Design a protein with these regions (language model features):
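A short, polar/acidic, helix/strand-boundary loop motif
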Residues: 1-22, 48-58
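Detector for Asparagine
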Residues: 3-7, 14, 32, 37, ...
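Intrinsically disordered, low-complexity segments enriched in small/polar residues
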Residues: 6, 51, 55, 110, ...
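RNase H catalytic domain
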Residues: 24, 28-98
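C-terminal functional segments of enzyme domains
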Residues: 78-147
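RNase H-like DDE catalytic core and adjacent DNA/metal-binding regions
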Residues: 135-166
Length: 166
């Protein structure tokens, strides 16, 4: 994001928490076929992200609220119970690989992935939102579900609408 622009000034208060939750949303979308009617536990090394997700909102970052809302809508629509759990930074192989990837170091990835993996794609809707993030965009989850359904990639049900959205 453009650091010169004041449009994202609010993001900087909880930017890392928002990015961690964006990773949760991406994982949820990529694993939708495998996680339907199951629990998806995602480990993050950011306490703020864990607490904000547990509360269901953030008082500091409205972009984080958008992502949390999208996770709730997508997970309920797909019948997936998402659990966001805290993990100490670089405390196991998975967290070390993830930390390396966040620094564009791919050297540890191949040993972790093995040979039987396939590429999973993040929905274009998320990429589009990342290019032009909007605060309080409570339709993001619905747009993601519409894209997943249009690809025929899952057994999605009608989009879930939380009571507070109306």
């Amino acid at each position: 994001w453009d650091n010169k622009s004041n449009n994202y000034l609010e993001v900087h208060t909880n930017k890392m928490s928002m990015l961690e939750e964006l990773g949760v949303l991406a994982a949820l979308c990529m694993l939708n076929e495998h996680a339907c009617n199951k629990t998806l536990q995602v480990f993050v090394d950011n306490n703020g992200a864990v607490f904000a997700y547990a509360k269901g909102y953030s008082r500091k970052c409205r972009l984080l609220n958008t992502i949390i809302s999208a996770i709730k809508i997508v997970s309920h629509s797909l019948g997936i119970n998402v659990v966001v759990t805290d993990i100490m930074r670089r405390s196991d192989e998975g967290s070390r690989v993830t930390d390396d990837l966040s620094k564009a170091n791919k050297s540890t990835l191949s040993g972790f992935m093995g040979t039987s993996n396939r590429v999973l794609l993040i929905p274009q809707t998320i990429w589009d939102w990342m290019k032009h993030p909007t605060m309080d965009d409570y339709s993001l989850g619905h747009r993601i579900i519409a894209e997943i359904n249009s690809c025929g990639g899952t057994r999605a049900v009608a989009p879930y609408t939380p009571k507070f959205i109306g």
